[in-house]
């Protein structure tokens, strides 16, 4: 199938140049037919019977796009829709979770999410390492992988929701489970963005959630208000959480209890902040600031969000998507070792780390 789609991708460029955008919808339908025929003709018995265990199945309602995003935004607007861009990669357990748990339709929540997404958005899938040519909103042409690099895509899946003018309404860096993705989608399609921030919208819903126990780990700073850094000191990990946050509790209960994680935590000062506490604090840069303003200035929207600062008080990395222990540990190691200075793409660092551990004979489970 990859060969088939590559063939179709090459053909479509000349086709569009000759016949124009009037053929777009017909060509999209033909793409699937041609790809299916070529796949059947070229498939060996093995490839015909055995699917790749690492492939991510994209739902059929995603658009087979020409990847000219200015045109895609305009076409979606004519249909009273907006564009949702998905960056993913094969072998990504979080991408699989998005496609199965969120968009798979196997549960009532998934069916509701899928119906709303189809109704309000034109969904377009991009490969983080792909070579298909894209034309971004500013007219810049680049293969998928270069566009991902330019947009600083650090996590898969990454979802970008564009408005009818092509502006980014929201960007989700990493996976969000259905119980969180559903309210985010409601905020996007329900007109709430015009009256309140996503952070405020989610906060009102979190009040109804069950309370979660506050962590008491020895790795946490006793004084979470003293965040100022000094040259040569430890880097800082600031954890923005709430007291009604199941993923926050899971992070402390699972990832932070791994034997390999505890030495890493010792290389950081780790502060846990919840909304409204502390009321005043000293920022990593040494400024006295209001606690709520500190979170707002950092554009904290989701809980948990972990923001890393170097010894100069500068933000160097963050994650706010749902992550299992392997990826949490990788993020802390990425900062603790200074690898972010040498390798700006976190996904490449993850690949190298996983390979290094495998060569050392250590089992790797990306979902554990």
Specify the residue positions occupied by each region the protein language model found.
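N-terminal secretory signal peptides that target proteins for export/translocation
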Residues: 1-25
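Bacterial N-terminal signal peptides
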Residues: 17-42
């Amino acid at each position: 199938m990859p060969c088939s789609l590559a063939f179709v991708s090459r053909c479509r460029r000349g086709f569009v140049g000759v016949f124009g955008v009037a053929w777009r919808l017909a060509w999209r339908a033909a793409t699937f037919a041609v790809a299916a025929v070529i796949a059947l003709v070229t498939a060996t018995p093995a490839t015909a019977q055995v699917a790749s265990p690492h492939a991510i199945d994209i739902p059929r309602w995603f658009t087979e796009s020409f990847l000219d995003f200015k045109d895609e935004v305009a076409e979606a607007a004519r249909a009273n829709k907006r564009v949702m861009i998905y960056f993913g990669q094969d072998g990504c357990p979080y991408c699989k979770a998005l496609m199965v748990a969120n968009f798979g339709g196997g549960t009532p929540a998934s069916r509701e999410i899928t119906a709303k997404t189809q109704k309000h958005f034109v969904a377009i899938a991009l490969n983080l390492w792909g070579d298909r040519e894209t034309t971004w909103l500013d007219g810049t042409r680049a293969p998928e992988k270069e566009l991902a690099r330019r947009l600083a895509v650090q996590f898969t899946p990454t979802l970008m929701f564009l408005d009818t003018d092509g502006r980014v309404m929201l960007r989700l860096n990493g996976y969000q489970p259905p119980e969180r993705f559903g309210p985010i989608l409601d905020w996007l399609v329900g007109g709430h963005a015009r009256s309140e921030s996503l952070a405020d919208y989610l906060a009102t819903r979190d009040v109804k959630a069950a309370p979660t126990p506050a962590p008491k780990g020895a790795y946490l700073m006793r004084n979470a208000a003293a965040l100022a850094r000094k040259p040569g000191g430890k880097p800082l990990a600031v954890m923005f959480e709430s007291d009604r946050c199941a993923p926050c509790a899971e992070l402390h209960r699972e990832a932070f209890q791994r034997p390999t994680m505890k030495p890493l935590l010792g290389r950081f000062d780790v502060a846990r902040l919840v909304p409204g506490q502390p009321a005043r604090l000293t920022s990593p840069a040494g400024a006295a600031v209001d606690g709520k303003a500190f979170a707002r200035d950092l554009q904290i929207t989701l809980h948990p969000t972990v923001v890393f600062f170097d010894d100069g008080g500068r933000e160097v990395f963050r994650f706010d998507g749902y992550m299992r222990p392997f990826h949490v540990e990788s993020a802390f190691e990425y900062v603790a070792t200074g690898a972010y200075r040498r390798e700006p793409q976190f996904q490449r660092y993850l690949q190298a780390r996983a390979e290094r551990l495998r060569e050392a004979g250590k089992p790797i489970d990306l979902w554990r």
